[in-house]
Amino acid sequence: MQNKKSHYIWLFLVIFVPALILYFNKVKLGLDLRGGTSVVLQAQGKIEADTMSKVRNIIERRVNSIGVAEPVIQLSGNDKLIVELAGIKDPQKAIELIGTTAKLEFRIKNKDGSYGPVLLEGSALKSAGVSRDQVGMPSVSFELNSQGANTFAKITRENIGKQLAIMLDNKEQSAPTINSEINGGSGIITGRFSMEEANNLANLLKSGALPVEIKIVENRTVGATLGVDSIKQTGIAGLIALGVISVFMIAIYKIPGIVADIALLINGVLVLGLLSGIGAALTLPGIAGFILTLGMAVDSNVITYERIKEELRLGESLHDAVERGYENAFPAIIDGNITTLLVAAVLFFLGTGPIKGFAVTLSLGVVATIITGVFVSKVILKLFIKTFNIKREQLFWKGALNED
């Protein structure tokens, strides 16, 4: 009796906990479902052990500066970074901000237009912000740290009358003439900026320069309307698949078919709850993986019910047939799902972007299938038999146990 109570408690938790997670924390939708931009960046040249981590941190600061909600920024391999920005209004602006190295340099500009060696770098920058120049045009003000301020004072003291070029990624932003020594470590960058350009430059300087040059190797933008259409189409496809499966299971297995359909709904809630719990985003490939695992869940029930039929044909009581049916089906269910789980693991570690989304959903679906196929459906079937006082010959359709 105590064992039965514990089973019911576990069944309640399996249903209630994922549902509670879903209620308070909705599943995040991937880029292909809610619209946005995906950019794959690749580092160029020599890469140190912590280079990509530094790149990720800087890119994250840049993305945060433009106010993107829930950005996805993840490392891929040894030299790539995937950046997903959902719901942004100006994808091109975001791409330019992300892909700029933002290497700030101060050089003396010679009379022939050439530039001298680098005298001061952006690493000495303490802060940057948008301001206005003497004629009211948008500009970028900056402040240097103490060491940078001392170097800046020395540069201006020794080069009075010369032009000091302020370079960003080897492009001159402005080249004011030095009239006197500048102390305090503050200055201003002018360059006929619009307010948006000045704001972007200030954000770049504040986030810091990337330690290596990066190249955009993939750029994909999905419109919000396309995302809505995708959700609608996949939702309809999923409901049709669920309806066909439900009718099929009841038509073939009667009461166990009803149990399988209930377990299928619990499986769906469990997968979505797990997705929400780990903060993973649901993508189109992920939905494909989700629907695939529903099919696998049905397959697990089919294996079990056929084993129960075999036991009933051998003359076992209904209770013993259910127990042995689940016991005999267990190895086949575990073997099939573990194999799928291994494939999903390979896809996750070797794949990128959409493939990873498919692998994550498939993995969670396998876990949910094992739980519902081995435990949940068994408890529900026993509960049905007890509650409705189902007899041995009533479990399946008439004549089902006479089949060879």
Swiss-Prot record:
Family: Belongs to the SecD/SecF family. SecD subfamily.
Function, in words: Part of the Sec protein translocase complex. Interacts with the SecYEG preprotein conducting channel. SecDF uses the proton motive force (PMF) to complete protein translocation after the ATP-dependent function of SecA.
Compartment(s) where it occurs, according to its Swiss-Prot or TrEMBL record: Cell inner membrane
Keywords: Cell inner membrane, Cell membrane, Membrane, Protein transport, Translocation, Transmembrane, Transmembrane helix, Transport
Pfam families according to UniProt: Sec_GG, SecD_1st, SecD_SecF_C, SecDF_P1_head
InterPro entries in the record: SecD, SecD/SecF_arch_bac, SecD/SecF_CS, SecD_1st, SecD_SecF_C, SecD_SecF_C_bact, SecDF_P1_head
Gene (UniProt): secD
Membrane topology: Multi-pass membrane protein
Major localisation: membrane
Segments traversing the membrane: 7-27, 239-259, 262-282, 283-303, 330-350, 357-377
Lineage: Bacteria, Fusobacteriati, Fusobacteriota, Fusobacteriia, Fusobacteriales
GO MF annotations, alphabetized: protein-transporting ATPase activity
GO cellular component, one term: plasma membrane
Record GO biological process: intracellular protein transmembrane transport; protein targeting; protein transport by the Sec complex
Protein name as catalogued: Protein translocase subunit SecD
Assembly, per entry: Forms a complex with SecF. Part of the essential Sec protein translocation apparatus which comprises SecA, SecYEG and auxiliary proteins SecDF. Other proteins may also be involved.
